[in-house]
Amino acid sequence: MTRVRRKGLAGIGLVLVGVLLTGAAQAAPAPGRAPAANTTAAAAAQVNFAPAPAWVDAQAVPLDAPVPAGGLSDGRHHLLADQQVRVAGGTQVDYRHNAVRAVNERGVEDIANVQLRFDPSYQTLTVHRIEVRRNGRVVSRVGPGALKLLQREASLESLIFDGRLTAHVALKDVRVGDVVETVHSVQGSNPVFGDKRFGSFDFDWGVPVASRHARLLWPEGRPLYWRLHNGARPATVTRAGGELDHRWRLRDVPSRVVDDNSPGWYDPYVWAEWGEFADWGAVARWAVPLYRLPEGPLPAVDAEVARIAAATSDPEQRLLAALRFVQREVRYLGIEMGANSHAPHAPSLVLERRFGDCKDKTLLSLALLRGLGIPARPALVHTGLRETTQQRLPTPWAFNHVLVQADLGGRRVWLDPTRAPQAGKGVAQWVQSDFGRALLVSPDTRELVPMAGPEARALKRELRTVLDASAGFDQPATLTVTTRAQGEAAELLRQALAT
């Protein structure tokens, strides 16, 4: 559910993360199409070969750029990272032009495999050029027949299926010193975002880049909001034809080295966010209809409500019983294709399938709590950004998780249905989720709200070691180690022992 900061150029180089695109389609005529190699013909129809759009300002590749003394990654020298985005009416196109030189054998291995990702349910990939240059001349050019479509499911190990495809090309006869140029665009809008557009531009990475060009064409008079991070300078803006042309040009961008052990909220990279959401309240209002419970009876849900209600009349015990049921009986599995990247599935379907992701489990929990008469609502959070979420531009990409905020007799409690089944006889014994700041999904929301205090985040573990040699130095001694965990530490230990 979130934009992931990357050390390399995976998001802007040879691999395009299509889920970050939020606009609608404006496709040029496509004289060539990729064949259906190992996917459906319908998906193959979403891949075109065509010239670049007329509005694109083509950038020259600095082929004479010297190889930096340090900072290269995997034998690659990134010569050009060009990204141009155009929003016009209800359409958006994201154009990329990247050029990478192989400086050694490892670099050849990497640049010879081109991967372009997109979601065929709402996006169209258009390949404009894929070429290999040697000594300044084009020695090979990729045609439609060379493209293979793969459904790799990159997040499979995390039990998430998103349905995105990878258009893959294995280039032939690539040598040390060759430059691979990839020019393509992606069109298409995830319907979950409605008519709102938002995105970002990166200006440095964990590798050096000889030339960086970023551009946003935006309709004049249409509201647009910016957030610049870590010293990013404002764009140079010109006006022409009813559009605002925002541009950045950077040369010889050095690499930025960041410790692998840095906390998840630490982001030293230079970048800019743009979008149409005026404030956090606007993001909350966007999410409200996604978590609106269906009217009328939900037989399977109502049956579970009746079971819990018959077992206890105490609101706190009802709350815990409902949450335990979702934690124990609904396993984690995310089917996040298309709009379901952010929209939950219906509670009845989740209960029938007995699996779901954080959105699905949250909506099912809300349905149970509604039936039990306990006020509750979803809360959007970011598990890594925590307090620094408030430094981001208000957009849906500021969040990557959702949980339940319930009102228990005036007490605000934060409960995560995706946790392993929790123990404890009351809320006081339960570990409440705390991710620093949360956005309550409600029409009345205006700002992010703080979650529990620092004491709730503390990992409490007591280790007691006793070496008993009282029987004498010539007798066996006894070593006893006792570990006592509390709070979050107890839940982590319990989960580890369960596996």
Map each language-model feature to its residues.
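Bacterial N-terminal signal peptides that target proteins for export
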Residues: T2-G13
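Secretory-pathway-linked proteins and extracytosolic
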Residues: T40-A58, V174, Q187-F198, D202-I335, ...
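Lumenal/extracellular ectodomains and adaptor appendage modules
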Residues: R33, N38-H213, R247, A300, ...
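Second-shell loop/turn segments in exported
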Residues: L165-A170, V305-T312, P347-F355, Q390, ...
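Hydrophobic/aromatic-rich core segments of domains that either
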Residues: R324, I335, K359-G453
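Short, solvent-exposed loop/turn segments at the edges of secondary structure
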Residues: R164, R175, V209, G241-E243, ...
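Short, conserved phosphate-binding/catalytic loop or strand-edge motifs used
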Residues: A303, G338-S348, H382-E387
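Bacterial N-terminal signal peptides
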Residues: G11-G23
